[in-house]
């Protein structure tokens, strides 16, 4: 455990941020799974939006976001 006051505060903030990031990533994965279970234009937009939000917040790399959206788009076209 940290001894310095600022380090203790940062550790607490890191825990909160980790929970927030995990929730955001989970929401993204849930949106993707919902689309894959039942491909539709509406679910594609929701999944694409979730991916973009995760990319903007730095949770996933921009290339991964692009790759994921391309794969979802290909499934929508089929």
Curated annotation (Swiss-Prot):
An individual GO BP term: translation
Keyword rRNA-binding belongs to the record: yes
Top-level taxon: Bacteria
The entry's keywords: Ribonucleoprotein, Ribosomal protein, RNA-binding, rRNA-binding
Ribosomal protein among keywords: yes
Molecular function as annotated in GO: small ribosomal subunit rRNA binding; structural constituent of ribosome
Pfam family membership, one: Ribosomal_S20p
GO cellular component: cytosol; small ribosomal subunit
The protein's role, per its UniProt record: Binds directly to 16S ribosomal RNA.
Protein family according to the UniProt entry: Belongs to the bacterial ribosomal protein bS20 family.
Protein name: Small ribosomal subunit protein bS20
């Amino acid at each position: 455990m940290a001894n310095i006051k600022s380090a203790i505060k940062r550790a607490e903030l890191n825990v909160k941020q980790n929970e927030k990031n995990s929730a955001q990533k989970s929401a993204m994965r849930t949106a993707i799974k919902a689309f894959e279970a039942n491909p539709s234009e509406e679910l594609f937009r929701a999944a694409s939006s979730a991916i973009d939000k995760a990319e903007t917040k730095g949770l996933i790399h921009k290339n991964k976001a692009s790759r994921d959206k391309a794969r979802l788009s290909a499934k929508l076209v089929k």
